């Protein structure tokens, strides 16, 4: 296209080298490889265990550049001044070329918007953390978890013993839970307790005097939103792809897995309710640990091996870990 446009071979080659250099060394890693026509900065590695970290976006990015290339190739045909071997419907070629360019830009726009949405949502979750950072909070003394997972849906029941170790009364109890997990009920004994939800924060309408303890049950169900993980790490730094040692491919990043084949959950994804936030985006090193006695019972493993910290014990209907 450049050559047919400029009609100068040397200048065309020079411009193409400059364009390739800009894409390769400057724009290749912008927006996680969106402007990389060669795909060198994309997660190309495929794991037999975890699969591909983002196959849909990967294919859309590659299709984006394929369509853009086809569009410019069509325009080059129209601008190439020579007698054709057979009659060419220039209008049809123009429509196809422009359509390819438009579709390519649309595919690229979708990839860009998805990445932009991830960053915006992470900023929203970080603002929520900062909003409630200075609120007085209780401490979870013990947490008894009953978890069942089917497909990409996680069902949990958490019995929390929360104590107010502050010198002042708590007007409400602050809890944290993954935003994709929907809380169906919070009960103190057999009594339902009112609560409000703001992203990953749960505000339980229960006063707690200094030194007072309360036990209530949180029932929840849903998926895992990985965008709430590691909010204390800069977005570009967190999603910067690293090459696999001894291999030309790069590996993508995932922070949780929930599926039929295997499930991997870490405390950072907030798959169970906690009273102290695991991160502090405003001051990453100012994080207070919450020392809690945990008991985890996993039901309906479907033959899969369950691995968790604590003492393992097989019980009727599931496997229990205490620690």
Task: Say what each PLM segment does.
Residues 141-145, 156-160, 173, 216-218, ...:
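Hydrophobic residues positioned within well-ordered beta-strands of beta-sheet architectures
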Residues 9-79, 83, 88, 118-127:
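Terminal transmembrane helical anchor/hairpin motif
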Residues 1-5:
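Alpha-helical transmembrane segments and their short interhelical loops
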Residues 169-170, 178-239:
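A surface-exposed beta-strand-loop module
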Residues 145-147, 160, 191-192, 203-208, ...:
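Beta-strand-rich interaction surfaces with strong enrichment in secreted/lumenal proteins
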Residues 161-167:
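Asparagine-centered strand-capping/turn motif at beta-strand->loop junctions
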Residues 37-43, 88-153, 252-258, 286-288:
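N-terminal, polar/Ser/Thr-rich
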Residues 219-323:
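Extended, low-hydrophobicity, Ser/Thr/Pro/Gly-biased non-transmembrane segments
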């Amino acid at each position: 296209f450049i050559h047919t446009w400029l009609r100068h071979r040397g200048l065309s080659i020079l411009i193409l080298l400059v364009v390739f250099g800009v894409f390769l060394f400057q724009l290749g890693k912008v927006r996680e490889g969106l402007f990389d026509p060669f795909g060198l900065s994309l997660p190309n590695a495929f794991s037999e265990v975890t699969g591909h970290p983002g196959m849909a976006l990967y294919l859309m990015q590659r299709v984006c550049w394929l369509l853009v290339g086809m569009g410019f190739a069509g325009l080059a045909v129209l601008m190439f001044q020579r007698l054709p071997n057979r009659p060419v419907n220039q209008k049809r070629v123009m429509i196809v070329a422009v359509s390819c360019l438009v579709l390519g830009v649309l595919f690229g726009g979708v990839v860009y918007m998805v990445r932009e949405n991830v960053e915006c949502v992470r900023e929203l979750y970080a603002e929520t953390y900062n909003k409630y950072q200075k609120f007085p909070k209780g401490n979870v003394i013990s947490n008894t978890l009953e978890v069942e997972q089917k497909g990409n849906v996680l069902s949990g029941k958490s019995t929390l013993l929360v104590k107010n170790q502050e010198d002042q009364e708590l007007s409400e109890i602050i809890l944290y839970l993954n935003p994709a997990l929907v809380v169906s009920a919070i009960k103190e004994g057999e009594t339902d307790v009112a609560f409000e939800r703001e992203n990953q924060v749960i505000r339980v309408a229960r006063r707690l005097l200094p030194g007072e303890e309360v036990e209530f049950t949180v029932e929840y169900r849903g998926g895992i939103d990985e965008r709430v993980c590691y909010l204390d790490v800069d977005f570009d730094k967190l999603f910067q792809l690293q090459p696999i040692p001894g291999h030309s491919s790069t590996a993508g990043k995932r922070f949780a897995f929930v599926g039929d084949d295997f499930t991997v959950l870490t405390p950072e994804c907030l798959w169970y309710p906690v009273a102290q936030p695991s991160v502090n985006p405003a001051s990453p090193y100012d994080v207070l640990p919450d020392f809690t006695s945990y008991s985890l019972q996993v039901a309906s493993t479907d033959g899969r091996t369950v691995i968790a910290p604590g003492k393992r014990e097989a019980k009727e209907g599931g496997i229990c870990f205490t620690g």
